[in-house]
Regions:
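Non-catalytic alpha/beta scaffold blocks inside enzyme catalytic domains
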Residues: 170-350, 355, 365-370, 378-379, ...
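Long, low-complexity segments enriched in small/aliphatic residues
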Residues: 353, 561-695, 886, 893
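N-terminal export/assembly segments and adjacent metallocofactor-ligating motifs
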Residues: 1-266, 293, 309, 318, ...
Length: 895
């Protein structure tokens, strides 16, 4: 009988033989090294294996790594296209330096040493002159755990900026206020009921590993409940689809919570033991007895409004469906899993309260740390300790965490251009790494204005594997490696286990297998494409060549004192000293830990891991539960905080418990007679990811982002499928095509945020198969018009497929027309927009965009007025128990 296998066995990876498909029917045997790495095209950290041709060293194919515990041999379309990225005719292969004005498109090739010397000189001068606060590193999806934070700490710089506040900060805050952990880790595979507040099955965080386990759980009989105003592919898989009106999810969740409490179908003993109900009664219900029975009375009165019938009015979901969902959750018991990352939480003002309401259901069911329930992320994510950790920064960077946002999760990154326009500071040296704020963030033309202003940003260094709209406005474009061209460690909370993955430059590894000496990764990669891990070491030595600044010592070898560390030494030390079980596993195969990770690309730290740390007995600290002192949760009360006294003490007492609070686009406030809609602009496609995926195979699948509009609304507007429509926002408009569907709530329009890439030059500045050529005309007073000249077209290159590009549409860039809308508590940009939709005018063309940046800045000030600034009750900038990247010394918290 034939032995069918999905992957070659690791024992074959050093010399795998396959037939060359392009030689068929001739049997042309080719030999490959199969070298594992980690995909770099989202944050799931899925394992991949690269088939490296032994003759040409070309990466011929990418598949999933079968020994990777998170992804288990599977990869999505974004992983498979890695060879497209490697061979992209429009990728950047050599370091470039700007010659003309920023944005002019005039570049010259420079050496790595020239770039390092210039950039290091600026940084050294800023450090010597005590201007560390003018150094900033701004990253999108990092694809690594902790390496660059260590670099910034070594420099003494509080300069880590991120994309979190256009991604997940409201969900993070909602989770953190409950447990002291800002991310959940659902055990979908073993759940009896799974509740998703998004199209999580097809495009969520973490897409591939979670999708596998959701379907696994469903195949074992789990009930899948999906709350999504769109009939997404996830909704289509649901046993119960609940298309709630956007922003009303809190009403739905509280109705379910009320039902569970009223019927007694909740885990009463867990709630009694682990929720800070005593504090809640003392603060809000002094007239009730300080007993759990008193808390139950208070809870029922607190949420008495939220009957299924009330929720039906608010959400549009029939009351019977709400009861059905509640019964499914009750039936699951502790095997109830759920997840919230973006979607509703990221879309709305007070979106973190939606997450608070969602987690209330987890708490009521006692599903924390249980099989089929929800873990805390740090139970399942493993971050190894590096050698010689530097001390924390000694100051607080107000451009990252301004006083107005003491509770933000995390840096107020998308407000940076407005802060600089207001004169709050200046950035001397600004690194963007795999981050494209001009395109990804709202209000991109304000970013463009600031990026062109050298008085606000002295030097912009774009660390990027590809061209982007933002890189076009930089001083240096430094090409960095993709998923098979770089070193990183990475782990994610994908399931109820713990693992560590290792990304590595596969051509470098292959050359070393050939016996060739490779000094730096750019000697092995195409052109002179480098990797950040080596780049930061080289740059740090340039900044502090003699060690007098106290920086160089953190980049010296732990094995060769005084000499520059190599990446083999950096990761070798980590794998030898910081990964439990790895040295023993390696020794069983007569390998070093580094050799083991190079061979397999991943290591399973724990096969099964559930969050039980809160139950561990302790001698001091912690919290007393039924007469036993235990560790508890990482909150001030050491309990699950139904009532957050932090919120109450830091100026938000009305939000101290989970509440339903309508957001900035409330369906009752829309003027439907004036054709106002709620624009849902933040849903994702399973084939694309922000700005890393403009490659031929993906865009052949997904290359347009029409405006979803319900059949009912389209008929009222007189719009048919394919018609041009103009969508007016608070600061401008964009023109796109309508897609008429029954799969969307009335009063809502929706548009995927992945597409609409553009470039300003015909043959550089963007992927020609995935971007449109545009003109941008400044009309004065902050007004800009963008018009597409043409979309994707066939073109000649070394890749014969470039002449076969058959699609022309590459979508419309909607984010340019969105004002910044920061949630005053979490700092999250609230993505949903109140818009007016109309048929396009005669002179309108597909892809037209108009923006008024002066109006945008005025609206920025309106939203800033909603904040309640620090200091808090203890005179600090931020609660000491709150997480933040690059946490400074305690004295820096003082205002």
């Amino acid at each position: 009988m034939t032995d069918f296998r999905t992957h070659p066995d690791p024992s074959e990876w050093n010399d795998y033989v396959d037939y060359e498909s392009t030689s068929w029917p001739k049997k042309d045997r080719r030999s490959y090294w199969i070298i594992p790495s980690i995909c770099f095209n989202c944050e799931s950290a899925c394992g991949i294996i690269a088939y490296v041709d032994k003759q040409t060293l070309q990466v011929r194919k990418i598949e999933g790594n079968p020994v990777h515990p998170g992804s288990r041999g599977r990869t999505c379309a974004k992983g498979v296209v890695t060879p497209n990225q490697l061979e992209d005719p429009d990728r950047i292969l050599y370091p470039l330096k700007r010659e003309g004005p920023r944005g002019s498109g005039e570049w010259k090739r420079v050496t790595w040493d020239e770039a390092l010397t210039d950039i290091a000189g600026r940084i050294r001068q800023a450090i010597v002159e005590d201007r560390r606060h003018e150094l900033m590193y701004h990253v999108g999806r990092p694809g690594e755990d902790g390496y660059v934070n260590r670099v910034l700490q070594a420099w003494g710089v509080d300069g880590h900026n991120s994309h979190t506040n256009v991604c997940s900060s409201s969900a993070r805050l909602g989770h953190f206020l409950w447990t002291g952990a800002d991310r959940p880790s659902p055990d979908h595979a073993n759940a009896r009921t799974i509740l998703l507040l998004s199209s999580h099955l097809e495009s969520g965080h973490y897409f591939n590993p979670h999708a596998q386990r959701i379907i696994e759980g469903k195949s074992r009989g789990a009930t899948l409940i999906v709350v999504d105003p769109r009939l997404s592919n996830t909704s289509a898989k649901a046993d119960l689809w609940l298309p709630a009106k956007p922003g009303s999810e809190g009403a739905l969740l509280l109705a379910i919570a009320r039902y569970l409490v009223e019927t007694g179908k909740y885990n009463r003993e867990f709630v009694r033991r682990w929720v800070n109900w005593e504090t809640y009664l003392e603060a809000s219900w002094p007239e009730l007895p300080r007993t759990f029975e008193g808390f139950e009375i208070a809870l029922k009165q607190e949420y008495e409004l939220f009957t299924p019938e009330y929720a039906e009015i608010e959400t549009g979901i029939p009351a019977e469906r709400i009861r059905e969902a509640a019964e499914a959750i009750a039936a699951a018991g502790t095997a109830f899993s759920t997840h919230s990352w973006r979607a509703a939480a990221s879309g709305h003002l007070w979106g973190w309260q939606i997450t608070r309401c969602l987690y209330l259901l987890v708490v009521l069911m006692g599903a924390i740390g249980e099989r089929g329930g929800v873990n805390l992320h740090h139970t399942n994510k493993f971050v190894p300790r590096p050698y010689n950790p530097p001390p924390p920064p000694e100051y607080w960077n107000e451009l990252l965490f301004p006083k107005e946002f003491p509770l933000a999760f995390f840096e107020m990154s998308f407000l940076l251009p407005h802060f600089l326009k207001e004169g709050r500071g200046r950035v001397d040296t600004y690194f963007t790494r795999v981050y494209n704020p001009l395109w990804t963030n709202p209000d991109g033309f304000t970013w463009m204005e600031v990026l062109q202003d050298e008085s606000k940003i002295g030097c912009h260094v774009a660390l990027t594997p590809i061209w982007s709209e933002t890189a076009w406005f930089s001083d240096y474009v430094l090409p960095m490696g993709l998923g098979t061209e770089r070193h990183d460690t990475m782990s994610q909370e994908t399931h109820a286990g713990r693992w560590l993955g290792f990304r590595q430059p596969v051509r470098r590894v292959a050359m070393q297998k050939q016996g060739k000496a490779v000094g730096t990764t750019y000697e092995a990669n195409p052109g002179e494409v480098w990797e950040e891990a080596e780049f930061w070491i080289a740059l740090s030595w340039k900044i502090d060549p003699d060690g007098r600044l106290g920086i160089r010592k953190y980049f010296e070898s732990p094995y060769r004192p005084g000499e520059k560390i190599t990446l083999d030494e950096y990761f070798g030390w980590m794998f030898e000293n910081s990964v439990p079980g790895l040295p023993d596993a390696a020794a069983r195969e007569n390998l070093t830990p580094l050799q083991f990770m190079r061979k397999y690309g991943a290591f399973q730290v724990d096969a099964v891991a559930y969050s039980k740390a809160h139950e561990q007995p302790v001698e001091s600290g912690g919290v007393e539960i039924d007469g036993v002192r235990v560790a508890g949760f990482n909150t001030p009360s050491r309990k699950l905080e139904f009532v957050s006294m932090t919120l109450a003490e830091w100026g938000w007492p009305e939000h101290a418990i989970p509440r339903y609070v309508p957001g900035q686009v409330y369906w009752r406030d829309l003027d439907r007679d004036a054709d106002e809609f709620d624009l849902l602009p933040n849903f994702r496609l399973p084939t694309l990811i922000h700005t890393r995926s403009p490659v031929k195979w993906l865009y052949e699948i997904s290359h347009d982002n029409p405006l979803w509009i319900s059949t009912e609304d389209a008929a009222r507007l007189g719009v048919a499928a394919g018609d041009l429509v103009k969508v007016r926002t608070a600061i401008g408009y964009f023109v796109t095509r309508a897609w008429v569907t029954e799969g969307l709530c009335s009063g809502v329009v929706a548009m995927s945020h992945h597409l609409g890439r553009w470039r300003l030059h015909e043959d550089r500045g963007g992927a020609r198969a995935a971007s449109s050529l545009v003109t941008i005309r400044r009309k004065g007073d902050g007004k800009y018009e963008m018009r597409q000249i043409h979309g994707a077209m066939p073109f000649k290159s070394d890749d014969p497929d470039s002449a076969r590009v058959w699609w022309s549409d590459v979508g419309v860039h909607q984010n340019l027309t969105f004002p910044v809308q920061p949630d005053p508590v979490s700092g999250m940009h609230c993505w949903h927009q109140r818009v007016r939709v109309e048929k396009a005018d005669r002179d309108d063309r597909y892809g037209d965009v108009f923006v008024d940046t002066e109006e945008s800045h005025r609206l920025y000030k309106e939203w800033m007025a909603k904040t309640r600034p620090a200091p808090g009750p203890d005179g600090t900038r931020r609660p000491m128990w709150f997480d933040r990247p690059l946490r400074p010394v305690p004295d820096a918290y003082k205002v």
